[in-house]
């Protein structure tokens, strides 16, 4: 009798383990954030959770299935997809199912998880990459798309990231402006439907709108309290952030290259890699979120990021185009008294036939304007050296 009971227990346990292995649970975590995915019975990947780090794995079993992680065009979901492609037969539907995943600790508190998805009818593969910076509480995401169809596949839309949130209210902060009037802050509550932050200006992508956003949950954002998600994209061209609240008051955030005029013909067996999207989740307001990005930039992105930074005096706001040698040397004297490390000469130092004396004139050439600098830039460099400060100079690629 005991043997039969043991065998029954063993078989039930084995069956449970087999079921669990068929539906892998994938955890992407930092010290303070959990992003959790799970494969459902239909073989597709769902985001179960994004928020404050879960301290006990047992909590996961009480989470709902969630929403499909990387929504495709042409399936049962009625809202904005993360990817839209056109196959060789002109069909544009895509059904991505889980294949496998891997996780690799690259050292220095960085862990990369790669989730591979494939369509079971078309030979299309999508790999979702998540790089978690443990101490800094930053997650970097990007997507790789490849295929083995006979002819090139047309990529119409290819998001770097798709995130799902479930809260009572959502408050979006965006930053817009113009020259000398940058980063004006606007916060608004999101309602059913879409809100888009985007640009179509190409190389001037951040001219009117900044490529980052701040999203507060439940209440308007505060400096030191409340849940906030901040995101940005590592891309200097056209970008788009789409925020869509659905009929269940759930929010999806799709981030990446702006699909406007951005169709890409992808040859077989080549890999298309999207730009990186970075985000941080904070339970201590936008102040903590900002500091997370500062820490990440110093530790992982900016060259010598933890070194002492130089202080600089730029003559532009003091003089604009109205300066001469003596005025600049006087500014250097004041900079030295203040302990400034570098003096930088800005616009207006070049051209003689058509000297640059206002922004209505061209950017000229590489000749110093004799009327302003009779002894050339060399004299200014010598004066800076005498005073023990560094010398810098402003140039633009348009100068001819």
PLM region descriptions:
Residues 1-23:
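Bacterial Sec-dependent N-terminal signal peptides
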Residues 20-25, 247-267:
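Short acidic, Pro/Gly- and aromatic-enriched capping/linker segments at domain boundaries
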Residues 22-36, 44-244, 260:
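Polysaccharide-binding surfaces and accessory modules of carbohydrate-active proteins
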Residues 32, 91-98, 264-283:
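Short Pro-Gly-centered flexible turn/kink motifs
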Residues 40, 148, 158-160, 348-350, ...:
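An acidic- and aromatic-residue-enriched active-site/binding cleft used to recognize and process polar
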Residues 70-99, 218-242, 281-302, 341-347, ...:
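Glycine-rich, aromatic-flanked loop segments that form ligand/cofactor-binding clefts
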Residues 266-267, 296-309:
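N-terminal amphipathic alpha-helix/helix-capping segment at the start of soluble metabolic enzymes
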Residues 304-400:
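Aromatic-lined carbohydrate-binding/catalytic grooves of carbohydrate-active enzymes
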């Amino acid at each position: 009798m005991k043997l039969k009971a043991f065998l029954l227990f063993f078989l039930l346990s084995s069956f449970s383990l087999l079921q669990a292995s068929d539906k892998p649970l994938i955890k992407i975590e930092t010290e303070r954030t959990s992003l959790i995915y799970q494969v459902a019975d239909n073989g597709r990947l769902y985001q179960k959770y994004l928020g404050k780090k879960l301290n006990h794995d047992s909590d996961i079993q009480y989470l709902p299935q969630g929403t499909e992680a990387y929504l495709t065009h042409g399936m049962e979901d009625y809202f904005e997809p993360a990817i839209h492609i056109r196959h060789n037969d002109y069909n544009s539907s895509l059904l991505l199912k889980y294949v496998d995943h891997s996780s690799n600790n690259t050292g220095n508190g960085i862990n990369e998880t790669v989730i591979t998805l494939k369509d079971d009818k078309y030979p299309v593969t999508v790999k979702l990459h998540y790089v978690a910076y443990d101490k800094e509480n930053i997650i970097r995401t990007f997507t790789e798309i490849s295929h083995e169809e006979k002819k090139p596949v047309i990529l119409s839309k290819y998001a770097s990231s798709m995130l799902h949130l479930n809260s009572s209210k959502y408050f979006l902060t965006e930053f817009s402006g113009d020259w000398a009037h940058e980063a004006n802050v606007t916060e608004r509550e999101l309602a059913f439907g879409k809100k888009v932050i985007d640009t179509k200006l190409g190389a001037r992508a951040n001219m009117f709108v900044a490529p980052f956003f701040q999203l507060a949950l439940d209440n308007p954002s505060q400096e030191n309290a409340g849940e906030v998600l901040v995101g940005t994209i590592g891309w200097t061209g056209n970008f788009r952030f789409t925020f869509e609240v659905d009929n269940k008051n759930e929010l999806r955030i799709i981030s990446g290259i702006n699909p406007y005029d951005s169709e890409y013909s992808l040859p077989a067996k080549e890999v298309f890699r999207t730009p990186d999207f970075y985000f941080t989740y904070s339970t201590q307001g936008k102040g903590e979120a900002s500091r997370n990005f500062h820490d990440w930039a110093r530790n992982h992105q900016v060259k010598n990021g933890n070194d002492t930074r130089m202080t600089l005096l730029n003559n532009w706001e003091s003089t604009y185009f109205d300066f001469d040698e003596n005025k600049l040397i006087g500014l250097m004297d004041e900079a030295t008294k203040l302990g400034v490390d570098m003096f930088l000469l800005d616009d207006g130092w070049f051209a003689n036939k058509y000297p640059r004396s206002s922004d209505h004139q061209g950017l000229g050439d590489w000749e110093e304007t004799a009327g302003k600098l009779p002894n050339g830039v060399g004299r200014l460099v010598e004066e800076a050296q005498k005073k023990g400060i560094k010398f810098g100079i402003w140039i633009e690629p348009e100068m001819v």
